[in-house]
Amino acid sequence: MGRAIIDRVTRLTFVLACLLVPVWGGATTLKDVKIGIHVIDFVTNAPSGRAGIAIVYDARIKESVEDAQLILESLSSPSLHLAASLKAALVDIRDLDEASALRAVIVADRMKPHYDSLAEFGRRTRTLVLSSDLDCARAGKCTVGIASNPRVEVIVSSQQAQASGIQFSEAFRMMVTEY
């Protein structure tokens, strides 16, 4: 019991420390990615055996491809401390249904036309869908929306989380805005 509390406090401290990290640049920032990765730690009912993180983009849109590449590079940043068990890969939106064993999906920039598909994928596969576009979560299409500029905001779509069967710890839910 004591170890669990220490783990939660450590995670909470790390998320709060992320607020002090400088911005990476581009549509999705390093800070957005750091916070998003730590959101995964607050999922209390994560399915076992899932270690993939799909960075979903639209290969037909240059800005989406560039943002996806920046997200992938930021996941390799030594300051991120990504768990060795989590493996990130770029996945074109047209190939998302073929991706398997995903723990989370990170949505690249310029994906608004695909929000319905992402929401349906999250519900069907019980996968956490993260976006740096807060409107994705506000619209109930992404599970979590994260923005770090001009100030940090984390929004959880209660509707999408429930439909996807995703539950978050109470400590996390106290730190975020739920829609």
List each model region and its residues:
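Bacterial N-terminal signal peptides that target proteins for export
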Residues: 1-14
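Short hydrophobic alpha-helices and adjacent helix-cap/hinge residues
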Residues: 2-5, 23-179
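Bacterial N-terminal signal peptides
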Residues: 12-22
